[in-house]
Swiss-Prot record:
The keyword Electron transport does not apply. Ca(2+) 1 binds at D40, T41, D43, N65. Pfam families: C2 (PF00168), PLA2_B (PF01735). It comes from Xenopus laevis (African clawed frog). The active site is at S229, D549. InterPro entries: Acyl_Trfase/lysoPLipase, C2_cPLA2, C2_dom, C2_domain_sf, LysoPLipase_cat_dom. Selectively hydrolyzes arachidonyl phospholipids in the sn-2 position releasing arachidonic acid. Together with its lysophospholipid activity, it is implicated in the initiation of the inflammatory response. Residues 442-452, 733-749 have a biased composition (Basic and acidic residues). This is Cytosolic phospholipase A2. Residues 428-452, 729-749 are annotated as: Disordered. It catalyses: a 1,2-diacyl-sn-glycero-3-phosphocholine + H2O = a 1-acyl-sn-glycero-3-phosphocholine + a fatty acid + H(+); a 1-acyl-sn-glycero-3-phosphocholine + H2O = sn-glycerol 3-phosphocholine + a fatty acid + H(+). It is found in: Cytoplasm; Cytoplasmic vesicle.
Amino acid sequence: MASIDPYQHIIVEHQYSHRFTVTVIKATNVTKGTFGDMLDTPDPYVELYISSAPDSRKRTKHFNNNINPVWNETFEFILDPNQDNVLEITLMDANYVMDESLGTTTFPILSVKPGEKKQVPFTFNKVTEMILEFSLEVCSSTDLRFSMALCDQEKLFRQKRKNKVINGLRKLLGPEKTQDLNSTSRDVPVIAVLGSGGGFRAMIGFSGVMKALYESGVLDCATYVAGLSGSTWYMSTLYSHPDFPTKGPKEINKELMHNVSYNPLLLLTPQKVKRYVEALWKKKSSGQPVTFTDIFAMLIGETLIKDRMNRKLSHMQEKINDGQCPLPLFTCLHVKPDVSELMFADWVEFSPYEIGMAKYGTFMPPGLFGSKFFMGTVIKKYEENPLHFFMGVWGSAFSILINRVLGVSNNSKGSTMEEEIENLKPKHILGNDSSDSDDEMQEPKGTENAKAEEEYLRNNQASWVQRMLMAILGDSAIFNTREGRAGKVHNFMLGLNLNTSYPYSPLSGLCTQQSMEEDELDAAVADPDEFEQIYEPLDVKSKKIHIVDSGLTFNLPYPLILRPQRGVDLIISFDFSARPSDSSPPFKELLLAEKWARMNKLPFPKIDPHVFDREGLKECYIFKPKNTSVEKDCPTVIHFVLANLQFRNFKAPGVPRETTEEKESADFDIFDDPETPFSTFNFQYPNVAFKQLHDLMEFNTLNNINVIKQAMVESIEYRRQHPSRCSVSLNDVESRKLHHKDSQSKFQM
């Protein structure tokens, strides 16, 4: 891999931290005073405190009845050298009821020079002497990677995957249309498959899509598969399966159908809840935040991957290291308290190789996500989070499922996505983001309309489950506040300096796609305040950050795929978002993605919503650059929507339905059915409903394979015409600043 990273340190200002090491060696003549010593021999220990350090307080073990203790214990603090760092040393006496301070002194850390090691004596109460040893070193490297470039592992994956893609294209398109493709050719297009959110509806629909793409050979031509919320649940199920890709989606989807056919109440048996609580307690006692999302994560994991709850995101590397499968990309949002996610949200991307935020160019290995950081250095490392924790975070909007099971109010059956998630939006998050306090405001609970025979079971199970969880966790706010339902992790950007930054794209001002006029960018798609604060930076002083379902801003994971470094030519997106009715226009989420792309100076084809008026509802729509010589970096988008059209009359492309049974099985609506079998918050799918949704999306995909193949051919031709497509040199990159939307130069970041 190249040793020079042209994007290094262009987002986070280059800075160093100091590692301050303290060894508490010993103390002599520890005393509680003449009268105190007559009553009791001291049980001494030492407490170290640096207010400016993130992990600020350390302590030694205590010795019983020992006036000359020898500790020889070493502690480390990561410090910002630009702050006035002072060490506070307190000699303590351990007691059964309340520990007693025997004296406090301070030490200015500035008196220790980098590279120096020295012993310093301290005197307490005129007779007690304590010896400490100090050393200071500069941390020249960090645990975070500061860059907008792809990591070396992804670059290596792309090289290996290219050979697989070439073979896939040759097999799918034929030798005539792929005769000049080779592993060194820039003609090989980068193809991405996208799946939207939408709960189990999205997961099941995407399972049918992936089966069609796998069996048709299209998946062999893709470099990336990106998902959001419900689609990530299917991707997690697929990529964590021990037999994938040897065993394809057909067999794995049968297992999925079986798993989602059960009532979620069965997950709340005493034995299972005891296991959940033990895991939550272990996490909380280790110093990690625990919220409602952690509980939901366990339930979604038990439903979908119950036989592999110990699997990690990094384990997926074995599925992609040789380029055998497309690289899976997952996402969630970082949001701020009391700010709508439509106004401000940072997209967080997850891959088996890295987790981070491209907006700031900060990334880390999956095993470090959730650890305590300061100035880019890990100060407390935890075990890598299990995959099911991420599944809960990626689909955290659906933590409302727990409220339903536990009888908490939510009368959202049959409502649109916007109505269903209104109470979960980050603009309602309560509390101080930087606080470590668990004190949270209370919300009143209500009741949910349900069948009478289910109400008794729900109420009784809910009461004891709540009592057990709250008794052990001691935190009723987990159930009763919106903040408790948002995921929360330690802020990995704590203490960093964001003075220098870039737009999401380093190609700003260089990309030649047609730009939207300013009034077009100001035009609202879903909300007058949408994206109002997307140029605002993350709060690097907050100790923790909130992370939520990306579908709360817009329901398609385009930000992952639009990173210029990935250079994607063809995007095949599948939108399972809720609509008011089956006949409603299907472009709202796509229009939001387009607006977000324009505001971040990223190439995106013009989305014309009037195509719906001209052509009506279709299974898929194509949006491409109008002039490839001008918009040479712009990808082509094939946008599939959730619609039951030709499937009603054909059981396979070109194969008509003949029997009454065949016709009746396909005669169903998605959003207009009064029974709402495909509701966003339906978490139990009978086999019949599963097969209907799965087979519908499999059919719609296969029915448009020729559309996909033609777009692939055109993408190869675009590459041949523009060999410099999506490339950028260091000389092209200009310095920019983060700014408010209403600043004078609105998009000159």
